[in-house]
């Protein structure tokens, strides 16, 4: 079953349900939500915009197990995205943001087709996964746990990569790379940056990849 809902504009997404969300940036289109799910799931959903945040969650005391839950949405801009649990967020097409911040709590997934911004800050706590394509001047990647950040196709000038645990980061850096690993995490990088600073405590590894 499908429902399309008109909503206010927003620049942040908070995903707290096991949904697959497809976001597009349209500066000249009215924001909307289009929800595809089982008919009995709609009444348990609480989808709203508050304080420029699109919040996607369930109503109090609701526990959903949909056979499918797919959400399509757009806004004029996006600056922040948070995924809690096992949700998936895809930024479709080209997305331009001044500064972009993303966070995954749990086993969720974020994928960006073409994200262009000045700075990007990404943090994963748990076993989540983030895959990035695009470019930025500066990136800050952090993992606590066993998560992964795949950014071999995300070009940055300067990057700060930190892992606590067994996570994995792949980065494409041209100028400066600062790495801090505590545990058995791995950082692989491309781009031949002339300045690479490493601090490793444990069995972590740093590898330059051609």
Please report, for each region that a protein language model flagged, where it lies by residue.
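Intrinsically disordered, low-complexity terminal regions
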Residues: 1-210
């Amino acid at each position: 079953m499908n429902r399309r809902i008109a909503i206010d504009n927003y620049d942040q997404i908070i995903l707290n349900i096991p949904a697959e969300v497809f976001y597009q940036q349209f500066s000249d289109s009215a924001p909307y939500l289009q929800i595809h799910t089982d008919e009995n799931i709609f009444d348990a959903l609480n989808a709203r915009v508050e304080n420029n945040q699109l919040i996607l969650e369930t109503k109090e005391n609701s526990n959903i197990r949909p056979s499918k839950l797919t959400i399509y949405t757009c806004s004029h801009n996006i600056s922040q995205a948070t995924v809690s649990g096992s949700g998936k967020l895809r930024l479709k097409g080209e997305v331009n943001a001044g500064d972009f911040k993303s966070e995954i709590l749990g086993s969720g997934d974020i994928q960006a087709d073409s994200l262009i911004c000045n700075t990007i800050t990404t943090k994963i706590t748990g076993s989540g996964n983030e895959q990035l394509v695009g470019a930025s001047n500066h990136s800050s990647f952090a993992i606590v746990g066993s998560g992964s950040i795949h950014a071999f196709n995300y070009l940055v000038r300067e990057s700060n990569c930190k892992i606590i645990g067994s996570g994995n980061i792949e980065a494409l850096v041209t100028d400066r790379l600062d790495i801090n690993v505590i545990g058995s995490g791995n950082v692989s990088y491309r781009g031949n940056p002339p300045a690479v600073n490493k601090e490793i405590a444990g069995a972590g590894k740093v590898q330059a990849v051609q």
